[in-house]
Structure formats: structure tokens, C-alpha cells
Amino acid sequence: EGYNFETFFKAIFCWKEIINDHKYINNYDYNKAVYLMSNINLLDNEFLLLKEDINFSSPISVLFYEYYENFSDLKKTLELEKENIQCIVSSMEINQKVNFGDSQSPNLWDYADDVDTLDFLLNLAN
């Protein structure tokens, strides 16, 4: 709790030109209008909307976030939702996490959804 999103917004500012894509801005404008008409609190940096929401899938131009009170609560939530999570990118000590910068360059032993693909395919016939 109490995270200051200013650091996050500064880090992604280099992507601000995405708002010039007509399909993206249509999504941004639509989602912003729907949320504002519904009196939903948003964080807005003029090209990305941040909405506090525990759901996994956010609309285009929206990023969902969730607060947690302490690290053990976060770890419990991640464990409960592990079937719904494909990849956790973090510098924290979390089971089966991927380091920043490595999510698009997996090792041979890193399996999507933690399923050994070869083992899965070999056991299909059984």
C-alpha cells in the first residue's frame, strides 16, 4: 500500500507516442469515458489509465493494479492464483519468478504455465 506511481509513470513516459495510434486512442477515450461516467477512480498519465482492480485481464489502454499490505499477503495471493498466472516478473524472492528483462528470453527449462511441453506432448498418447 502507499505506492507512488510517479516513478512508474516516468519509466513508461517514453511510450507516450502510442496515444497517436488512432485505434489505441479510441480505446483510451472509450475506457476513460466509461470509467468516469461510472465514478471509478483512475490514475491517468494522458496515454495509460490505471485502475485498481483484482481482475487479470484489462482492456486496451488500461492497466489493472492491486495493493497488498505486506509481502506474505502478496505471496499468498500469487500461490492461490498460480493456475491463472503465466509469468511473474520481479526482483523480489518469489517462487518461479522471472527477472526483469528475461520474460521474453526464457531458458530451455522455463516452461509456459509451468508445464514441461515435451513431457506434456509425450504423455498425450497415454
Question: Predicted regions: what is each one?
Answer:
Residues 1-126:
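NAD(P)-dependent aldehyde/semialdehyde dehydrogenase
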